[in-house]
């Protein structure tokens, strides 16, 4: 069901999704291994889709933690709400550009981590800049923005907003 929903939405909205199929477990593990789960109180996920990362984040997240999953796609938001029943999960149908407000509305303060797979290279430059600046502002001072992409196009934009940017490659994705 998840793969069908994901693929159908890729066909309907190819610029909103970075790939025809969800991320591999290799990418999920590689990215999430960078999280210090002992200090992961609040995590924000942009573009959770069918929950490939979301489910694994919840599996690793401490009992007192919170995960705010933000997706512009109504089908994905509804799917996550139906399939991932967890009190720590807050599914929002909306824009990553409004993530700061979403955290404030839930009394969650700043995020320890923001995880994002939304395709920055296909979005309007103004929206991309707004999302990156919003993300910078909502992170704890020692927080991290973990981005996975299929191209390097977002790197110069990340470097304009974030002081320390590093990249890695996962060949098995």
What residues fall within each predicted segment?
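Conserved class I S-adenosyl-L-methionine
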Residues: 40-49
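A short glycine-rich, Lys/Arg-flanked "PGG" loop and its adjoining helix->strand segment in the class I
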Residues: 129-141
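S-adenosyl-L-methionine
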Residues: 77-105
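Conserved beta-strand signature within the Rossmann-like core of class I S-adenosyl-L-methionine
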Residues: 142-149
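Conserved SAM-binding motif I beta-strand of class I
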Residues: 66-71
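Conserved SAM-binding loop of SAM-dependent methyltransferases across substrates and taxa
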Residues: 50-62
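Class I S-adenosyl-L-methionine
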Residues: 154-173
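Class I SAM-dependent methyltransferase Rossmann-like catalytic core
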Residues: 3-38
């Amino acid at each position: 069901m998840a793969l069908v929903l994901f693929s159908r939405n890729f066909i309907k909205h190819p610029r909103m999704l970075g790939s025809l199929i969800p991320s591999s477990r290799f990418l999920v593990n590689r990215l999430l291994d960078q999280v210090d789960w002992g200090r992961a109180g609040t995590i924000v996920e942009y573009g959770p889709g069918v929950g490939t990362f979301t489910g694994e984040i919840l599996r690793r997240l401490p009992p007192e933690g919170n995960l705010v999953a933000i997706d512009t796609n109504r089908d994905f938001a509804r799917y996550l709400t139906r399939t991932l029943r967890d009190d720590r999960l807050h599914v929002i149908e909306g824009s990553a550009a409004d993530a700061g407000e979403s955290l404030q509305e839930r009394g969650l303060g700043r995020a320890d981590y923001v995880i994002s797979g939304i395709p920055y290279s296909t979005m309007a430059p103004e929206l991309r800049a707004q999302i990156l600046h919003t993300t910078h502002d909502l992170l704890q001072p020692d927080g991290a923005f973990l981005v996975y992409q299929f191209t390097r196009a977002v790197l110069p934009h990340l470097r304009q907003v974030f002081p320390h940017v590093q990249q890695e490659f996962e060949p098995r994705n």
